[in-house]
């Protein structure tokens, strides 16, 4: 958990080089840190509907969750060759610029990825606020997407759960889940249906509940008997999307972030653009995902923030607010840092 102090702004694309040069002189960083993050937006699969009773106040809330990891940018040229990376300082024109990113949830993707799960509270309200103050709760996990082929002989049963001594009926109750390397935007109904079937199975059989310390990979089911002389393969998968479904969340959106990051004392300054999937693209799915700008105006978003360990550290919070105000005053002729509207930063699910 962190208590984040922040100010935001935006600049047109033609002021990017001037802004970068100014921040390089201010921070002393000739080469800023690169930002390439991929974010999944998820919401709880089941809405909480509290029972309203006279004189009783229910404080239980549900929140949207952000799942953040890194991504690699691939730019495809006219000669059909894929070049690694692209220059964020170049303007991007939707339907003309060709930005293709590699899929994450494929059988070939065996990279160990670090995912950060974030849930943020609504910012602090009140007048005369020097900056936005918000509580952010986060957890980090390491996950590797796997797809392992297992050859099955004639009539050999599949042991779905090696830690479970029960076979037979329990094996046939397991739902079949096939993803074939699809992205979250392509797995709309499959994940939801499979998640619902799995939750029902878990309710009926408490011994199949997934343990966080030792997660069991999902396995396809096969018939108990196979025809003579025929071998069949099954694929055991461990997908991050399955983990979210087991956690009780479903993916509703996604976006990519590309930019640079500066450090000025305790202040982190990020300059970035946000990309989304180009739904109008007819490119082959094997080539990857084509992106387009979320904002057609080509503006850069700017965020300056400080993370405080605890909200009870009053001295650190007051010192951080003063530092952000000083930075705001110093850069006022370049761009104006301001407090974002707290209502747009409310991640609570409306009942």
From Swiss-Prot:
InterPro entries, per the entry: Mediator_Med18
One GO cellular component term noted in the UniProt record for this chain: core mediator complex
Subunit structure of this chain's protein: Component of the Mediator complex.
Source organism of the structure: Candida albicans (strain SC5314 / ATCC MYA-2876) (Yeast)
Keywords: Activator, Nucleus, Transcription, Transcription regulation
One GO biological process term: positive regulation of transcription initiation by RNA polymerase II
Protein name in UniProt: Mediator of RNA polymerase II transcription subunit 18
Annotated stretches, region: Disordered: 153-231
Organismal lineage: Eukaryota, Fungi, Dikarya, Ascomycota, Saccharomycotina
């Amino acid at each position: 958990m962190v208590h984040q102090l922040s100010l935001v702004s935006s600049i047109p694309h033609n002021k990017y080089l001037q802004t970068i040069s100014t921040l390089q002189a201010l921070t002393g960083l000739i080469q800023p840190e690169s930002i390439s993050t991929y974010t999944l937006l998820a919401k709880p699969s089941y809405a909480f509907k509290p029972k309203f009773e006279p004189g009783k106040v229910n404080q239980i809330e549900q929140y949207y969750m952000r799942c953040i990891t890194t991504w690699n940018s691939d730019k495809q040229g006219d000669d059909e060759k894929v070049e690694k990376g692209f220059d964020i300082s170049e303007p991007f024109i939707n339907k003309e610029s060709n930005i293709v990113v590699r899929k994450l949830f494929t059988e070939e993707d065996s990279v160990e990825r670090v995912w950060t799960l974030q849930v943020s509270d609504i910012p602090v309200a009140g007048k005369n606020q020097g900056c936005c103050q918000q509580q952010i709760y986060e957890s980090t996990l390491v996950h590797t997407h796997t797809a392992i082929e297992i050859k099955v002989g004639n009539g050999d049963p599949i042991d779905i759960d090696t830690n479970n001594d029960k076979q037979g009926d329990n094996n046939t109750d397991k739902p079949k889940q096939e993803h074939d390397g699809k992205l979250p935007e392509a797995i709309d109904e499959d994940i939801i249906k499979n998640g619902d079937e799995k939750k029902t199975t878990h309710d009926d059989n408490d011994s199949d509940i997934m343990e966080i310390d030792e997660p069991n990979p999902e396995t396809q089911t096969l018939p108990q008997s196979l025809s003579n002389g025929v071998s069949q393969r099954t694929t055991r998968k461990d997908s991050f999307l399955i983990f979210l479904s087991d956690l009780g969340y479903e993916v509703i959106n996604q976006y990519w972030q590309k930019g640079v990051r500066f450090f000025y004392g305790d202040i982190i300054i990020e300059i970035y653009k946000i990309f989304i999937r180009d739904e109008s693209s007819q490119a082959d799915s094997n080539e990857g995902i084509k992106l387009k700008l979320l904002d057609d105006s080509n503006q850069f978003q700017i965020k300056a923030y400080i993370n405080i360990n605890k909200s009870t550290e009053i001295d650190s919070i007051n010192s951080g607010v003063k530092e952000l105000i000083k930075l705001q005053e110093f850069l006022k002729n370049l761009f104006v840092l301001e407090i974002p509207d707290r209502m747009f930063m409310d991640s609570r699910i409306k009942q």
